[in-house]
Amino acid sequence: MTRKSFSIIAGALAAVLMPLTSTTAYAQGMLTEQNAKTIKDVELSADIVVAGGGLSGVCAAVSAARHGATVILVQDRPVLGGNASSEVRMGIVGAKGDQNAEAGLLEEMQMRNFRFNPLLRYTLWDDAIYSTVVMEPNIKLLLNTSVEDVVMDGDRIAAVKAWNINAYTRYLIKGTIFADCTGDGILRLSGAKYRHGRELPSEFDETFLDEGGDAKTMGNS
């Protein structure tokens, strides 16, 4: 091997190994002091904190905001809508029967979608949900933000801790009322009672429900 060819090979290996060495150092925590300087800690508060930005969380947040409450809506994805968003594409399929349709806020979002998205593109459907939320002045929306823990005051939730890895931001979000609309029961971290599966139709007098009382669950986004 000539000196020239050795230099070329050594340079190529250095180029490959340098990022690997940096990645290993990061994984081993060698850069934590530097990273800590870039992490922002933000404290927020609202009347109602909604965890989960699927359709249930969106409807809860918008309804509360229109009744005068201040709301913080925390969604761990870059879009709203959950299983009905462009990420999963289940759509709105809750109404049972050929002649039945969704009403209320769901119908409002669908009408906005039909008006501005006649070809029913899922990416524009995301915009219809998003605009419904951001047009409400009482709602603060946190996308790409995951609830990871709760802060208890006795037997009540005083705050939730959340993390946005894209913005390197940690949130402490205080509230009076907390709504778990994640679909995953994340606020069970508080020790609150929760259930897994479907309830019996008779439990809440759900006349349109013809089955239940089992361990079936939906997928999630």
Question: What annotation goes with each model-predicted range?
Answer:
Residues A10-S22:
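Bacterial N-terminal signal peptides
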